[in-house]
């Protein structure tokens, strides 16, 4: 794929997102529906109450339509990879959509309970793995260049990977523009890896999501006019995990997605510390809230986290090359 061809899915998905988002925002404003702020959240988030959410639905639809259009499966120009990744994007998006819908329109602030959400994510991971193996893809784990034949245990790993990173991105989505920027960097990185491996279906999906995120960022940067919601964050995390598996570069997500890992680790450490000692390690978790309570502005947190992500992504590409 030439660089000029690579612009097609980016521009297409970005344009659809930019064009549709004002209508989506207008609908929420007309219905007077928006984000509810949890009482245990940061106090400065109270000003965000009522901001439209579920914006991830717009860029997901744009990315899926673009992926189908550019991939042209009806002309037999695509491989099963295209369908598998579109399936993951759609399924985890549906789980997030149900969670958001219950929060906003059913006025139940917690949305799906943790067991319901986890069950949906696990089922999604199981279906992904079964389809993945049925198409003859290898069940070996690439651990920093070392191929580990895990057999059936690779299925357990794949499910854990999708569930873990879908939740990790969801935890990271806590301030204006953060995940939109991180996602742009992550999908650009995997797009480069896919191009290097000549996995063009993966490249098409990466570029389609990248374009959607660029269009979404125009409305999600501080002060955000709309949030992506769980429909966006769960889908992005699940897709990143699936892409790393399809490229047989699972380990790279630990570097490319280092911020997501840090955010999740901060929550786990905070909960463990409080249960064992009654003391908190951070002022608030996930860790972006800790920095916020230390006086950092949202823009400062965004920029520093983006820079860290760029550096770790470049290190990843250096390792692969």
UniProtKB/Swiss-Prot annotation:
One of its GO terms (cellular component) is plasma membrane. GO terms for molecular function: metal ion binding; phospho-N-acetylmuramoyl-pentapeptide-transferase activity. The keyword Lipid metabolism does not apply. Signal peptide: none annotated. Its cofactor is Mg(2+). It is a multi-pass membrane protein. Its main location: membrane. It is found in: Cell membrane. The chain crosses the membrane at residues 6-26, 50-70, 82-102, 118-138, 143-163, 175-195, 200-220, 226-246, 251-271, 301-321. Pathway: Cell wall biogenesis; peptidoglycan biosynthesis. It comes from the Bacteria. GO terms for biological process: cell division; cell wall organization; peptidoglycan biosynthetic process; regulation of cell shape. The keyword Iron-sulfur does not apply. Pfam families: Glycos_transf_4, MraY_sig1. Belongs to the glycosyltransferase 4 family. MraY subfamily. PANTHER family: PHOSPHO-N-ACETYLMURAMOYL-PENTAPEPTIDE-TRANSFERASE, PHOSPHO-N-ACETYLMURAMOYL-PENTAPEPTIDE-TRANSFERASE HOMOLOG. This is Phospho-N-acetylmuramoyl-pentapeptide-transferase. The lineage of its organism: Bacteria, Bacillati, Bacillota, Bacilli, Lactobacillales. The gene is mraY.
